[in-house]
């Protein structure tokens, strides 16, 4: 029997449950595991699971399920922030995957409200056997989904989307970009003509809205709070790169792994506090330094983020980081190979030529 497993998010990996469940499933046959999502890739690296969990592609969980659809049975593992967020996640993913095959979701193992949900239940003997076995071994109840899933509606030319399981003060991310902060447990995003225009129960972050540009709230990936709550020991790669190309990232930092693939990169220039936090943390695992351009509006979206030694963060004093990013894009030769110090000197020269005031932090 062939079992396809999709693992979503860092929490299920950092908790040790991803590996435990994969080993339990081996009793029933051959297990093939794929990751869904981005921050989970860093957790896989930190936990030395690259040979067990495939992280070679950047896939959404529904895409990972589709890629594994030729297996006899599918498992979806997740460790949501709460029961409602976990069930909502499962319902959205299963509907987007649109597969006519049983999917067993394992949600929040180790928590009192942890559950197992059987999606597309065909009442087959083997599905029941696996679900009951996991229920017993993990001490989880088999339950029906308690969520309505994706709650999106339209009114007077505007699109509304309810966000589940939000805590006051949490950052709200849409497609990897921080767009606002929650002021209430009840949060509804509002878009008009493809632009995010308001957050009921929250406040907008203008810089994030500009970076987001067009958004389809029916398809958008929405997260709240900290992207990785319990990081294990980071596996920092230390390597000296003599020279290489420069990449500038000014949007969703989660995409950085794709952008550095086979590029021979000496450093990544990250524009924005949140982008710098995410990119710095990811790139430390690949031995790549960053040059961060920030203006001090960082949200807590990672616990204890790591930045590679030798990296430099600039805190801009008289301009928005986005504007500085545009100046760098215009003036830096991205087709030229630099050594790190040469690149740093060139960035400072551009700052001075454009009267950009900054404070410099060397890691």
Curated annotation (Swiss-Prot):
Pfam families: DUF2117. InterPro entries: UCP006598. It comes from the Archaea. This is Uncharacterized protein MJ0065. The lineage of its organism: Archaea, Methanobacteriati, Methanobacteriota, Methanomada group, Methanococci.
């Amino acid at each position: 029997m062939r079992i396809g497993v999709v693992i979503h998010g860092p929490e299920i990996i950092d908790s040790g449950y991803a590996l435990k469940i994969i080993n339990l499933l081996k009793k029933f046959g051959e297990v093939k595991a794929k990751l869904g999502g981005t921050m989970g890739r860093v957790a896989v690296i930190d936990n030395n699971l690259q040979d067990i969990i495939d992280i070679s592609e950047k896939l959404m969980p529904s895409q990972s399920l589709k890629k594994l659809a030729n297996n006899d049975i599918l498992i979806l593992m997740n460790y949501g922030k709460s029961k409602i967020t976990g069930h909502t996640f499962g319902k959205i993913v299963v509907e987007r995957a649109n597969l006519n095959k049983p999917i067993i979701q394992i949600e929040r193992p180790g928590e009192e409200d942890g559950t197992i949900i059987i999606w597309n239940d065909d009442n087959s003997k083997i599905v029941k056997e696996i679900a009951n076995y996991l229920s017993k071994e993990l001490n989880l109840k088999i339950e029906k989904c308690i969520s309505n899933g994706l709650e999106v509606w339209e009114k007077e030319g505007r699109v509304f989307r309810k966000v589940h399981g939000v805590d006051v003060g949490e950052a709200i991310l849409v497609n990897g970009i921080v767009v606002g902060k929650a002021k209430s447990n009840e949060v509804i995003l509002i878009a008009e003509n493809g632009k995010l225009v308001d957050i009921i129960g929250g406040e907008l972050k203008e810089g994030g809205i500009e970076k987001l540009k067009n958004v389809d709230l029916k398809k958008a990936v929405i997260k709240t709070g900290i992207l990785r709550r319990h990081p294990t020991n980071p596996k920092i790669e230390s390597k000296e790169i003599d020279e290489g190309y420069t990449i500038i990232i000014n949007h969703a930092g989660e995409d950085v792994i794709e952008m550095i693939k086979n590029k021979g990169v000496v450093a990544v220039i990250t524009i924005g506090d949140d982008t710098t936090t995410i990119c710095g943390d990811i790139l430390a695992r690949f031995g790549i330094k960053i040059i961060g351009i920030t203006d001090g509006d960082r949200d807590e979206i990672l616990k204890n983020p790591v930045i590679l030694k030798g990296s430099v963060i600039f805190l801009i004093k008289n301009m928005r980081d986005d504007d500085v990013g545009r100046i760098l894009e215009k003036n830096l030769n991205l087709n030229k190979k630099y050594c790190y110090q040469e690149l740093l000197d060139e960035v400072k020269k551009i700052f001075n030529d454009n009267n950009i005031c900054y404070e410099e932090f060397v890691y």
